[in-house]
Amino acid sequence: MGKIIGIDLGTTNSCVAVMEGGKPVVIANTEGSRTTPSVVAFTKTGERIVGEPAKRQAVTNADKTISSIKRHMGTDFRVSIDDKKFTPQEISAMVLQKLKADAEGYLGEKISEAVITVPAYFNDAQRQATKDAGKIAGLDVKRIINEPTAAALAYGLDNEHEQKIMVYDLGGGTFDVSIIEIGDGVIEVLATSGDNRLGGDDFDERVTRYFIDEFKKAEGVDLSTDKMALQRLREAAEKAKKELSSATTTNINLPFITATSEGPKHFDLNLTRAKFDELTHDLVERTAIPVQNALRDAGLAPSELGKVLLVGGSTRIPAVQDKVKQLTGHEPSKSLNPDECVAIGASVQGGKLAGDTGAGDILLLDVTPLSLSIETMGGIATRLIERNTTIPSKKSQIFSTAADNQTAVDINVVQGERQFAKDNKSLGQFRLDGIPPARRGIPQIEVTFDIDANGIVNVSAKDLGTGKEQHITITAGSNMSDSDIDKAVREAAEYEAQDKKRKDAVDTRNDADSIVFQTEKALSEVGDKVSADEKTAVEADLNHLKDLVAKANPEVMSEGEVEDMKAAKEKLMNSAQALFAKLYESAQGAAGAGPDMSGAGPQGDTYAGDDVVDGDYREV
């Protein structure tokens, strides 16, 4: 069986890991970082870029740069880029494709399977949307697991003694808290709670708003309407937040933030940790209720917790750590890397599914975060499965008709904790018809809820009198039909093919540029060791390739232009062979006294041939 990678698909940053040699390994991306910004951008030429390169160009391309798309998963939100609309699943799939490609580059093999994590408080629609994103990216999602559970799995690898822990997970866009029992090879989630609209992005937004207000007071200019200035302020706010985790004050200096009739304006402000805490106090306070709810649902007092684990980059904020200590009475543990532990846990689960012995025999028992109900007479939400029920789970209940001679029933499936169906999230509706006419209350209709290990819901309704049955896998919330997903898969494959063509163009141009440089250097050093005719032939081929390199733009090179450059490169290599041979002989004859050209010819190991990328490159 092939490798199953573990992916933490985050709001602001994502991470990928894999079990290798019996241990989880975090895979660095092509830029050398162990986490990848969950950012996608489209350039003016229509090229797609993902991760750090996309984040770097956001200031000058704010309209076509997409971030924090995870907050829209499972909704009908669309991103408009030029004439095309993208679903959150499609944008997320682009991030997943990047992570998949990085994993393939590291492992040297194709990857087709993954375990992907989601916030514990994600509803069914959001989980299904995440699976759809994986499918679009070319991944068979073997399991969806909750982020706090994945963190506990990473922690449980090295902690066998029995204990109850709290995982406090404050990420870029979501907040989760889970109470988990670890012991005897079992990781059991006792309760979970959270807030899907609370995370580091909200802290950044508060600071950005403060910057805007302060600048308006000082200069009379509203920067909120200037997209480029706003993006610079957001990036500065994020940077300031991070710096204030270790420093008590930071300076924000943004020259030429805007211009008025008076001339250019500069932004210069000192922000203290005390002011930051004041701006974000209510956000930190919002984490208290989910913590209290999770403890109550688990039937535990804070003193019964053995440890509190911090997960997510936002837990580095000192005020957050202080709040955790206040709520639990425990000094929070920092034994896990908050940016990587979720991906590590996902890779452990992937290793288990792939049969990797290094993943151990840990049994994972997770829960559904929200109650599942159907709408009954009067709009009541009648619960079949309570929140914090261990999954997978199956529950059936008998219902009947509400009116005489009723021949059909509409089943409205809802998720949430409110008493009335309309106040909860509707996951989908379906109809069971063909019920024989009878007095109300006589027909026996069995409704069954079945939640799989991914937390995804299947619902069926059966008329026990006739045996007629209808069932539905809840997918309505993701707003993508099977045909939509198939289309997105094809488009994602096209993007992947375009990326490969573009990389081939970049590599070919860089390779050709390197050969031009080495040939020019060789011509200047060879002197009269080769004939004038040989030099002329080399110079003709050199000038032809040099001209192609000068005109080439890898972003828009056609396949024909790439092939022409490859052919010109081969021609120059062949004609310059004698040139490099003479230099090699000269170097040997000089017994190392002259310049070291060993291996400089086309047969030498250090010649910049097809597999060598020139060091002087432009990041793309």
Curated annotation (Swiss-Prot):
One of its GO terms (molecular function) is ATP-dependent protein folding chaperone. PROSITE patterns: HSP70_1, HSP70_2, HSP70_3. The keyword DNA repair does not apply. Transmembrane segments: none annotated. Gene3D superfamilies: 1.20.1270.10, 3.30.30.30, 3.30.420.40, Actin, Chain A, domain 4, Substrate Binding Domain Of DNAk, Chain A, domain 1. Keywords: ATP-binding, Chaperone, Nucleotide-binding, Phosphoprotein, Stress response. Pfam families: HSP70 (PF00012). InterPro entries: ATPase_NBD (IPR043129), Chaperone_DnaK (IPR012725), Heat_shock_70_CS (IPR018181), HSP70_C_sf (IPR029048), HSP70_peptide-bd_sf (IPR029047), Hsp_70_fam (IPR013126). Residues 590-620 are annotated as: Disordered. The modification Phosphothreonine is found at T174. It comes from the Bacteria. SUPFAM superfamilies: Actin-like ATPase domain, Heat shock protein 70kD (HSP70), C-terminal subdomain, Heat shock protein 70kD (HSP70), peptide-binding domain. Induction: By stress conditions e.g. heat shock. HAMAP family: DnaK (MF_00332). Belongs to the heat shock protein 70 family. Acts as a chaperone. This is Chaperone protein DnaK. The gene is dnaK.
